[in-house]
Amino acid sequence: MLSSYFAPGSIVLQDVSPSFEAAVAQSVSLLVGSGKANPEYVDEVLETLRVLGPYFAIAPGLALAHAKPSAAVMEPGMALLKLTEPVNSGSANDPISLIFSMCSPNVSDHLEMLGDFGELMSTEKVMNSLLNASAQSVISEILFKKAL
């Protein structure tokens, strides 16, 4: 279940970020702060962004920042940085205000997390609710399926 991947403090609302790369770094840093990954994982995700471009921007307003399963990851984890002022990633899905980050130590966890995330985010109601949410508690309720 998706909720088991989020640690306390891994959902943050923020007004602005100077760039998409900075927002990605901040979102992934939430995984480091929660003990799910080492600081090296931030570098791995940013390198993925530099090499592959803004493929993290997977839907209008939504990005899922991640790297391949890594030794820099201690346990599966997810985090979310929601920006009040969206940033441009350089993709057709701009502007981006929801920057999820994901980490996994192995392929099976990685695929399971992607499936859980895709299942939740596949409904327009969830997407719109997250995009319009203005409080951390509301976002938590949406993600953990209490408000839907």
Residue locations for each model-derived region?
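Cytosolic covalent-transfer regions centered on His/Cys nucleophiles
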Residues: 1-148
